[in-house]
């Protein structure tokens, strides 16, 4: 839990202070993240191959959309795509590490449920990851891209279930994070719905 919280704090601070540089040098950041991931893959346990760092990036990506309008939201939203790509690189490393581990120790077909949910989350993440690169995104129609990225909510649910079903000492922490996000997202959608109703009423009366 401490590792995740510290990582989240550092990601937020770094993104707030260097948001312009992150956008400008995103390709190099992706390359650096990939190199770190490759090195991590060869090690027994690191914060990358154990999934902590990827999770931290995604928690920031999840919650930034729910912040009230402010300078911190403006800056973090400006690099949200970059943070999602970096988080995906680290999450992919975590997933591949445990898939290889399960094959090496012959328990791939006898693993706990959370293992397969984790694999499912990686499968859902892949199209989101690929289409987050601007060079790919530019080739996709805006509506199509938005519809595809609705899968991000499926991804969040799968990750939450994966972590909660592990039932380790961080169970309560994961429950608060993902349960809290679910409640906040529902409240945010309700707020937007109620704000849109008066506008629709005015349009109806005008017609």
What are these regions (language model features)?
Residues 1-207:
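Membrane-embedded alpha-helical bundles that constitute the cytochrome b-like, heme-associated redox core
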């Amino acid at each position: 839990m401490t590792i995740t919280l510290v990582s989240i704090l550092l990601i937020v601070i770094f993104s707030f202070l260097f948001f312009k540089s992150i956008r400008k040098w995103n390709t190099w950041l992706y390359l650096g993240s990939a190199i770190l991931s490759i090195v991590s893959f060869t090690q027994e346990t690191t914060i990358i191959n154990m999934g902590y760092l990827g999770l931290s990036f995604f928690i920031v990506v999840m919650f930034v959309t729910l912040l009230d309008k402010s300078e911190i939201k403006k800056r973090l939203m400006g690099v949200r795509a970059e943070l999602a790509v970096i988080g995906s690189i680290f999450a992919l490393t975590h997933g591949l590490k445990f898939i290889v581990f399960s094959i090496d120790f012959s328990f791939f077909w006898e693993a706990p449920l959370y293992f397969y949910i984790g694999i499912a989350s990686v499968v859902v993440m892949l199209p989101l990851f690929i289409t987050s690169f601007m060079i790919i995104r530019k080739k996709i129609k805006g509506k199509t891209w938005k519809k595809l990225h609705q899968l991000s909510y499926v991804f969040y649910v799968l990750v939450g279930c994966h972590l909660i079903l592990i039932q380790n000492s961080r169970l309560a922490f994961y429950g608060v994070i993902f349960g809290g996000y679910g409640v906040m997202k529902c409240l945010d959608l309700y707020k937007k719905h109620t704000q849109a109703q008066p506008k629709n009423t005015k349009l109806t009366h005008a017609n």
